Regions:
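Structural beta-sheet core signal
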Residues: 1, 26-29, 116
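A short, conserved acidic/glycine-rich loop-to-beta-strand motif
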Residues: 22-32, 37
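Short beta-strand-to-loop acidic/aromatic patch adjacent to the donor-nucleotide binding site
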Residues: 1-7
Length: 143
């Protein structure tokens, strides 16, 4: 799954191979970059929760975020069969109403093996969700 407002040139094949080798239920592109919202990972690379750095909110409630690694989500994710089944169950429970995938990951990280993936090589990454951000990305790619 690739969010439509993300432009990147990382090696997707490397991420697919890492996902297959790990046996994870889901693998998320992550990076050590500034973001008000950070995913929280343990030393093994498994997602344990989420933190809003602006408000101090941590989910799941009661999670001790100390010692966990903070990384920003990059908008690219690979889902295995268990994660797809869990997404379908969430959709059914909500009567087919739309829902955000990040709250799903946060709510499911205790049951599903959700892993972060950081590419080995340098890559470009842009949020192109506004005309201004798209213009900045275009300028970088044309340089």
């Amino acid at each position: 799954v690739h969010n439509a407002d993300i432009l990147t040139d990382f090696d997707l094949g490397e991420m697919i191979a890492a996902h297959a080798a790990s046996g994870a239920d889901a693998t998320l592109l992550v990076a050590r970059r500034e973001s008000s919202r950070q995913l929280l990972f343990d030393a093994s690379g498994r997602m344990r929760g989420w933190e809003n750095r602006s408000s101090g909110e941590v989910r799941p409630a009661g999670l001790d975020a100390g010692g966990l690694d903070r990384k920003a989500f990059g908008g690219v994710h690979i889902l295995g069969e268990r994660a797809c089944r869990a997404l379908a169950a969430r959709s059914r429970a909500l009567g087919g109403a739309p829902f955000g995938v990040m709250p799903f990951y946060i709510d499911s990280c205790a049951e599903l093996d959700i892993r972060g993936f950081e590419p080995a090589e340098a890559y470009r990454w842009f949020d192109i969700g506004t005309p201004e951000k798209l213009a900045a990305a275009e300028k970088s790619y044309m340089a």
